């Protein structure tokens, strides 16, 4: 459960990402594909090379979902319900892969915002991403 301080930290961190969220989403995806090659199996039809339009496009989708979650911190299950259905029933993404992407998102934010990504912000964003993952995997059962 996110505390009031966590919510403040998440909103502030995501506010820094701002209009460039899609770029950071794509950077995190590229990082994930390089670090955890098994995650590429969900994207056999994508050009996964650095800077590809498909990775950038999916990065925007990831960023949009996270922006929706930030806007609905108190009601993420409803805000992400359709996305949860998609990942559980159609795409059948391994729940572990959400943790891998979360890690890559944290690394991306820490690398791109070193002074703003304090230990407290890191902890709050980590809790937020874990909450998003829990929501996205809730319909697997």
Swiss-Prot record:
Entry comment describing in which tissues the protein is expressed: Red blood cells.
Pfam families according to UniProt: Globin
BP terms from Gene Ontology: cellular oxidant detoxification; hydrogen peroxide catabolic process
Record family assignment: Belongs to the globin family.
Function: Involved in oxygen transport from the lung to the various peripheral tissues.
Assembly, per entry: Heterotetramer of two alpha chains and two beta chains.
Protein name as catalogued: Hemoglobin subunit alpha-3
């Amino acid at each position: 459960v996110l505390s009031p301080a966590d919510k403040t930290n998440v909103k502030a961190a995501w506010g820094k990402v701002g209009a460039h969220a899609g770029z950071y989403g794509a950077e995190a995806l590229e990082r994930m594909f390089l670090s955890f090659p098994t995650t590429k199996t969900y994207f056999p039809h994508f050009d996964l090379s650095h800077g590809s339009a498909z990775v950038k496009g999916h990065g925007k989708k990831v960023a949009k979902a996270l922006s929706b979650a930030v806007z609905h911190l108190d009601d993420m299950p409803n805000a992400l319900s359709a996305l949860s259905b998609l990942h559980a029933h159609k795409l059948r993404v391994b729940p572990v892969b959400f943790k891998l992407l979360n890690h890559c998102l944290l690394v991306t934010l820490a690398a791109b915002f070193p002074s703003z990504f304090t230990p407290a912000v890191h902890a709050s964003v980590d809790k937020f991403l874990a909450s998003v993952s829990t929501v996205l995997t809730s319909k697997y059962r």
